[in-house]
Amino acid sequence: MNEKIQRINFGKIREGLSLPNLIEHQTKSYADFLQLSVAPQERKAEGLHGVFLEVFPIESYDGKVKLEYVNYEIGESKFSPIDCLRDGKTYAAPLYVTFRLKDEEGVKEEKVYMGELPMMTPQGSFIINGAERVIVNQLHRSPGICFESSFHSNGKTLYSFRIIPDRGSWLEVAFDTNDLLYVYLDRRKKRRKFLITTLLRALAAALSGPSSPLGSGGDEEIIRLFYTVEELNLSEGIDEDKVATKVLVSEVKDPHNPDVVLARAYEPVTRSVVRQLLDVGIQSISVVDVQYDDTLIKCLKKDPTKDPVEALKEIYRRLRPGDPPTESNAKLLLKRLLLDPKRYDLGRVGRYKLNQKLNIQVDPDIRILTWEDLVAATRYLIKLRKGEGITDDIDHLGSRRVRTVGELVANQCRMGLARTERLVKERMTLFDVNTEGMTPQKLINPKALSATIRDFFARSQLSQLMDQINPLSELTHKRRLSALGPGGLSRERAGFEVRDVHPSHYGRICPIETPEGPNIGLIATMASYSRFNDYGILETPYRKVLNGKVTNEIVYFTADQEENYVIAMANTAVSEDGTILDQRVAVRFRREFMEVEREKVEYMDVSPKQIVSVAAGLIPFLEHDDANRALMGSNMQRQAVPLIQPEAPIVGTGIEERVARDIQAVIVSEVDGTVSSVTGKEIIVTPTGSPVEQKKKKSKQGSEREGIVYKLNKFMRSNAGTCINQKPIVKKGQVVKKGDVLADGPSTQNGELALGRNLLVAFMPWNGYNFEDAIIVSERVVKEDLFTSIYIDEFEIVARDTKLGPEEITRDIPNVGDEALKNLGPDGIIRVGAEVKPGDILVGKITPKSETELAPEERLLRAIFGEKAADVKDSSLRVPSGTYGIVMDVRVSSGTARVRKEKINASEAKQKIKEIEERYDQKEEELREELTQALSNILLNEKIPLDVVNVETGEIIIPANRKITKVLLRKMAQAYDKIEIDPSPIRSKIFEIIGNFEAKFEQLRNDRELELDQIESGEDTEPGIIKQVKVFIANKRKLSVGDKMAGRHGNKGVVSKIVPVEDMPYLPDGTPVDIVLNPLGVPSRMNVGQVLETHLGIAAKKLGFNVATPVFDGVKEEKIREFLVKAGMDEDGKSILYDGRTGEMFNQRVVVGMIYMMKLNHMVADKIHARAVGPYSLVTQQPLGGKAQYGGQRFGEMEVWAMEAYGAAYILQELLTVKSDDVQGRTRIYESIVKGENYLETTTPESFNVLIKELQGLCLEVNIGQRSDVIGLSVKPTTPKALSGGEAA
């Protein structure tokens, strides 16, 4: 038994919260989308249920027929996740939806199959066509409102706001240089803009009703929304200074003569105006004060429209220039753009953001734009222009949110159902004349929905093949946040600001882990403790602080909420009872760092590692590494290949075990119990106190398989080609507790993540072999397989039915000798266990050649021998170059089309069916024996006063009052589902036992049917496919020169030399070092963490313990010195070293210690390549490039210059002609080499001919001539007619 690794944790900070489940955000999101655990009638209007409620009911155009949605249910998946991975299937379950059709005839309810819905595995991934995929969470601009400012070329600041819906047109309102407010819909600039007052008037028409405060949409109603209207009494006299900023609300007419306008609307109140009004007897007027702002007054003056209908037409004219505007058309357009919930939806988040930002109380269920939103937003914009309030930072996490798996799939379902809706309406119209035969099944075509979902999972930018190199890469992929994808940013458009680290990322997005290259900053990773709230906004936890004392209350804050509080760091000194010790504390407040008195602290970080991601949290002494190197370190841990002998790090950070558990790389016991059986393929744990365990104590009878069975994954191929293999770490009879690790997986040791090995390192130069980050490795590391990994390559071949006849997988291949066929079986498929090299045949296949006119003798042969004499070519599957290994598995699947036609396939199918039947008959017999044993415990040698009757045959199995024997009990077990006994106490006991076994019998029957279905359905191969063969080749790769290695601190390098153990530098006690690194790799890179790790590693190794040094709370330097002295070393960690070759001592003492190194997925075996004979490009006739194409090396322009500099004319001629694209020259030099001559004759290179053709395409006539050994070239303009010899017009 392997003991659990015990680590001494040097973290001084008491964490207020343990790490959450690291993949829960994926599983919870999809569970919320499906709501499987909720009864159909109790489901919330969200996820899949919400999408159906949005689209349905669907009414016919005439309103006579209505199709309503009732509920949905999801069936059981046909195959288990493991079967889907093995057989290349999709892990999905059938979706059944109940619809109700209401027409003139009545109501019809029917359950309709809507296709297969991919199901999430417990690990948070999907299996699509046999490959594990992850749906990456998308970080996008949050729906809601955003206030911005920009600078005009005249130096003026122009303010604007943008209302972004979840679905629908964007609405932007912006100031222009004349302080007028213009509206832009869908970012349409230039002529398609209109004034804000025009939109408000139009909304008055669209929202006409008693509750609308816009009333009739007149000027006065609009003014009252933004200004306080005062009544000015003129008879009391006026103070000119007080009324200087007041203007009239509406025009004033002469009461005696209404045609005379005494004062116009918005005219300033002056002494002359007042006198004029008093003269006609007007005592008071309505005015507004425009001292604060006159924007709306200016807009009303400029507005060409005066009533709502005019406003509607004006908007229509702007958005649909050229179309004649009518009131109904204009109203319909505005409703479609902003007021139709099916076309315009702010979403839950958008409504929440609008209410929060504008401080309004609109009902959360109203998700269209309201007059209240527009008025409040315009008021806020006017305040901004006056210097009140602040603009929004679009890079702040408060302005961004996450679309989770559930939401992304729901959006696809919405698109699919929108297509279904159109089809349903069309079909309703077709049935219009006669609704008699109309049913929901006939109206609905499920293909629209299933095709959309399938397309999303297979092709979407956010559905990615899972990064499966090791468990950490898998976990990080599931915790990734992408700003790319549909509705997101594009690489080319994204500037520096959106990629940069932002203060609001603290505790939510890791500031370290992001890819290097074009995606830097666009793809981020969730921080360790972060989670999404119900609105998809990232939150991070804090501990509440009351009067300078830290409580255990945990509160989650979004980036917006956090800015209102004073928050202390996690490393603030705290006493045992939670009291903050320092009088003044370093805190964060409104994105700034400052010091305050401890009483002012309101919250505190829960852990120092809450700001970094899981991968960065695995780097010990992260606080001593430069950020760039930490980024490389966290990225390279994800590239570490699983080793065949993994070893957990001596110096860890304490979260290694959580990573292995949460990603389910290790198998964990679900119960307290005893290990009853251990094999390489499964572990069985019998729960403590279970009836089986008690029975075993009483007697030695009973099945060994009783208990919980844990199946182990054995030598499975990951997406990256690495090996997934689980091995037991418990023994039979061992007592385990719930949560104990039963089996290790890839890159784990005793339940902890183990990506590499601990090696004895020396930081010193060694004969120049570790120049420029190169790494010197001891031969011991290679011999003992410390860095050996297993790779599994998959090769596939398909035999199809072609026009010329069927392809055939066979051993009978033309023109192939016996030597090449020695490892093939009689069916033409390589045997498992065969050792293969490049060029070997894996699967023999022949394909019919195109038919040609046959000679009489061939026709005779064809007539005598049938199809076999037909002309066929060899199209066998061969091992590609660079691949060596052993065939570990072969999988063959046959198509249905030919099972009936080909005798061999039919007999194979029969044989398989027979085997399945026999296997399940045996299992059923074993289960009946168990039932007999269970019945024996209460009935053997007993008598019961009632008859036990077989209700099907009427036979009395056990007569009343007869002594019950084992034979009778077996008879009873045979007919367990057909027996009947009159009511009595013994009856309930018997039926209780039978009831326990019924589910097991049912499961067996289902499994049997499933396997038989698979045989009969031809294993679901595509149409036209006769046979499909997959061959898996395992390849054991040792560490070799050219392989890339790295530590956890971004200290990467390539193995430059593998040195014999006796030549390696050694310690005074004779121990040779394992690896030599260049000390110059440390100072300029500023990743001192590797040196501290080296010192602490050797001390811990000598003192016999493992270390956990959490990030930002690690071991202090003094403590490391103390350990080094305790371990009998110098406190500076340096040792005397001797040269292995000479035995002499090196001049300087050297840093020697234990460092954790990983082998990365960049191996020389994958990269090394040389071309001998290979394919050429069709156009240029030059060799192709790249290893995949078996290409050559490009001899480019600069290389030509180098040759010219040396005057190597003949080598250059050879390179640019016969070795490249001189087609005739290639043939001739081949002939001369075969003949043993050394003669080079060149002709015109093909690329020159291509150039001439291109010039001719530009109507330039090119002529090549030769005069007295000088080749001349003339280029002159011409016409298409001349070039084509008169063919072209």
Swiss-Prot record:
Write the gene name. Answer: rpoB
Q: Family assignment? A: Belongs to the RNA polymerase beta chain family.
Q: What is its EC number?
A: 2.7.7.6
Q: What class of enzyme is it?
A: transferase
Q: Name one GO cellular component term.
A: DNA-directed RNA polymerase complex
Pfam families recorded for this chain? RNA_pol_Rpb2_1, RNA_pol_Rpb2_2, RNA_pol_Rpb2_3, RNA_pol_Rpb2_45, RNA_pol_Rpb2_6, RNA_pol_Rpb2_7
How does this chain assemble?
The RNAP catalytic core consists of 2 alpha, 1 beta, 1 beta' and 1 omega subunit. When a sigma factor is associated with the core the holoenzyme is formed, which can initiate transcription.
Read off the InterPro entries from this record.
DNA-dir_RNA_pol_bsu_ext_1_sf, DNA-dir_RNA_pol_bsu_external_1, DNA-dir_RNA_pol_su2, DNA-dir_RNAP_su2_dom, DNA-dir_RNAP_su2_hyb_sf, RNA_pol_bsu_bac, RNA_pol_bsu_CS, RNA_pol_bsu_protrusion
* Alphabetical UniProt keywords: DNA-directed RNA polymerase, Nucleotidyltransferase, Transcription, Transferase
- Catalyses which reaction(s): RNA(n) + a ribonucleoside 5'-triphosphate = RNA(n+1) + diphosphate
Q: Which GO terms describe its biological process?
A: DNA-templated transcription
Indicate what this protein is called per its UniProt record: DNA-directed RNA polymerase subunit beta
